[in-house]
Amino acid sequence: MGKKIRAILLALALLITTAIPVGTTLRKSVDVKADDAGIDIVFNFTGADLSAKNENGVGYQLYTWSVGGGDGAAYDMVVNGDTATYKLHLDYISTLRQGFIVRFGDNWDAKDFESDRFVELSDVLGGTITVDIKSKEAKFDVDDSQAIKGLKVTSAAADVNDLTKITFTVGQELTDTASANIRVRSMYTGEFIGVTSATPDDTNKAFTLVLDTALERDGAYEIVYDSSDEFKDQTFMIALPDYYVSDEFENANTYTGDDLGATWSAASTTFKVWAPLATDVNVNLYQSGNEGANDLIQSVPMTKSDNGTWVATVDGDLNGTYYTYSANVKGNQVETIDPYARTAGINGKRGMVIDLASTNPEGWENDKNPFTSPNQEDAVITELHVRDFSIEQSSGVSEANRGKYLAFTEAGTKNATGQTTGLDYLKKLGVTHVHLLPVYDYATVDESIPNNTQYNWGYDPQNYNLPEGSYSTDASNGAVRVNEFKQMVKSLHDNNISVIMDVVYGHVYNAGQFSVNVLTPQYFSRVNSNGSGCGNDTATERNMVRKFIVDSMVYWAKEYHIDGFRIDQVGLYDIDTVNALVKALKEVDPNMVLYGEGWSMDTNMSKDIRLATQTNAWRTPGFGYFNDTTRDALKGHLFTETEVGYANGANAAKVADVISTITGEPAWADDPEQSINYNSCHDNKTLWDSLRTRQPANGYTEEELMKANSLAAAIVMTSQGVPFFQTGEEIYRTKTNADGEFVEDSVNSPDSVNSIKWDTLNDAAYASSSDYYAGLIALRKAHPAFRMTTYDDIYANLNVVVDGKQDDDAVIAYQLNAKANGDTADGIFVIFNPSKNTKNVTLPEGNWNVYVQGDKAGTEVLGTAKGSIDVAPISATVLVCEDGTVKPVEPNNGGNGDNSNVTPGASDNNKNNDAAKPADNAAPNQAVRTGDNTLVTIALIVVMLVACASAVVVLRKKKFN
């Protein structure tokens, strides 16, 4: 049994995960007068408190998009009594499906129902459709009795091997193709291409067109047809074989050089850009970085070079000169920033030539990663946002540097009562790594406004290779943001803190305006793909996209001394790209820490690839994934607001998942370093707010909630794998709006919601909690036994002695072996008591020193114990034997008497055994969310029994532990 069986069961479950719900259509036969005014869809929403508003004063919104039509839009719904309504008008009757989400407020993640849903329009030409939606319900009703029905092309694709053939389908039977007047037209020239025949299949819904001229692979074409006498000249774009992944394109246009962008020297600057479809390219030199400023110095023609690149060298010292590229692409004149720009002017519209060496702070040449371990398990990571860290006056940071990179360079900061804040606080906390939310150039904060109070997390990338300007003291000077970013990194390094950068290559802010797509249309983005939930997905499988991502991250690692990366929505990436990143980054620094969000998402891939999801973790060695099992086990399932977890309700149903956390072994992981264990991150509610929201039936006092917070932290900090927490979790960080309501996702909420409130340290309970976290971190760092690097070691050295089944209080206790992973201890014993009762737990034979008890934790002995110990309600206790009196742990194989039937680890011999691994790219139709998510492993297994009998077996288990 063990890990192999769990993996096989998980694969079976994921392979049959159910699809996204669709609506029930109420069909009536009515005569509707045709007109050509488009399609109206009336959305009616009921069953929610329609008077409610979020912190931005926004109530329920409808977010809707035409499938295949690019980005969608959000609309405020009009409330009338108990119904909120929005009437959507579609000018383009060629729309086949209209997607919609009802959400509370203006945040992506505040969906009323988890899944994206769709209204089918495959035979609708006009009139009105009514969609009735009930809050929190999957089913919705569609009334199309007032719709005009008719012929509609629903798909069209050129033959991959013969570009004179096109296959197209229609939504209703077509027996007379002549009446439809079917033609093929070039979208570039407007010229029609002759059709020699149109042959139907047996259904009269699928047809093969034969053309008298072959289509061009890099062209754009559409079918033109008449739906009826009233609806003539309708169009549908023909899908061509993906020219960008063809051997012809990739062999001719895959550039492998390392000199893209502007390469500066005092004597000259060489500009090189990849634009394989362009017929001419110029580099435009400007005096300023302000878009629209009439200050062109000169426009220099570029010469076509190898593998789709264009190059120009301009003599003279151009340091500080701003520039763009203009190009003729398929007859269109375009201008854009350099995709490889190293820095830019205000709002990232013009790149800037820069002497990077001139931006280095003093001592930069000797700066290096203070994290010297190649084992990711040795990291302790805290996540924070640059602005949140210091924007409050209580941060003690100088006014000029509040919310800026330079806040991290100020030592000795304190709040008004003398409590340590800022950089010194991080140092005191003892974390090894600070994970910074996006600090590349993002789109949604206007840098032209000094000290702009506009706020965003930054998951809306605009330029990937330069720092965000709003965090610098002068966004108008491209050199300042580079220098100040480096000062921040060096200061953190000088204080023994490594820097992890949060990167978002899986989607861009605006696909049509993103520089790569401007120069090579649609190259960076997958076709008609929105798995990210942000309007576009990045085509990581294309050669030059993969190169761009690897080049970019290696550049940050080398130029800015970044020590690790967290990849947003890495489940959209192909595993080859992730493995290329791991290889390239580990070559820069073997101690690099790498992890991401491995949620399974629905995305349209242009090649036969595997995605870097949790279930494919074994295919991406050296790369970790957020362990949502831990999160949901400790505080309750993210998407079930009424559910309590192990730490905040002694939920016995969560015990198995807590033990899988302790052993660093979620069902999908292949190595302990792949399990990023956490209670909270920037997404969703803070841990403290979640605990206050989720309480057992008998309720918790504030003191008990504080204990639950500490217990959840203790489990993460003493478990195998990699501990991670949101900065402020240790001081009960809350995010509430002006009305006192919890903010679920504060992506664009004001500073009043997002900032770290350093004055809370004035409260003794808050300061004590901070000390508790610091003590846990110090204890973890002092004991390698908490940081074992293989499942073989864990299997040999960790024994679950009390597995939560001994009584109704779900107590768990485990023992770590003497000298495990090079530890100096003769044994470690850890006990978790989530109940409201004091529990007496029998200790293994030996003399034990207590290091964690009640609200105290650290590396100082708090007391001694022998035989047994009382464990306080809702608390953790950690004891260490240091005199050789404890017996060594026997391997935990599920046969340890009555104490345990849980296997904590699996042999590393399975690491290369395909049969032991989960299915690839599982759950493709799982509901998608930006930021945080949950791996769906709950499924129905339907077993059909032949011989006149059938049975349905339902297997429902969160993780197969």
Regions found by a protein language model. Name each.
Residues 18-36, 927-936, 954:
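Sec-dependent signal peptide cleavage junction
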Residues 35-54, 81-160, 210-270, 292, ...:
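The feature marks proteins involved in alpha-glucan
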Residues 275, 319-321, 862-891:
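C-terminal beta-strand-rich structural cap/linker in extracellular carbohydrate-active enzymes
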Residues 387-560, 570, 574-589, 593, ...:
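Substrate-binding/active-site clefts of carbohydrate-active enzymes
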Residues 672-845:
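Loop/helix patches that line or flank the sugar-binding groove of alpha-linked glycan CAZymes
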Residues 887-932:
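C-terminal low-complexity, Ser/Thr- and acidic/Pro-rich disordered "stalk" regions positioned immediately N-terminal
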Residues 943-961:
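C-terminal membrane-anchoring or membrane-association module
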